[in-house]
Amino acid sequence: TVLKTDAQCNCEAFKALSLP
Protein backbone atom coordinates (compact mmCIF):
# COMPACT_ATOMS: atom_id res chain seq x y z
CA THR A 1 0.00 0.00 0.00
CA VAL A 2 2.90 2.34 0.78
CA LEU A 3 4.16 1.96 -2.78
CA LYS A 4 0.73 2.79 -4.15
CA THR A 5 0.51 5.91 -2.00
CA ASP A 6 3.99 6.97 -3.12
CA ALA A 7 3.03 6.48 -6.75
CA GLN A 8 -0.10 8.60 -6.33
CA CYS A 9 1.86 11.35 -4.59
CA ASN A 10 4.44 11.26 -7.40
CA CYS A 11 1.71 11.46 -10.02
CA GLU A 12 0.24 14.55 -8.37
CA ALA A 13 3.65 16.19 -8.03
CA PHE A 14 4.44 15.43 -11.67
CA LYS A 15 1.11 16.92 -12.78
CA ALA A 16 1.76 20.08 -10.76
CA LEU A 17 5.22 20.38 -12.31
CA SER A 18 3.81 19.82 -15.78
CA LEU A 19 1.28 22.60 -15.20
CA PRO A 20 2.47 26.05 -16.29
From Swiss-Prot:
Q: Which domain of life is it from?
A: Eukaryota
User: Which protein family is named in the record?
Assistant: Belongs to the plant LTP family.
Its name, as the record gives it, is Non-specific lipid-transfer protein-like protein
Q: Which organism is it from?
A: Jatropha curcas (Barbados nut)
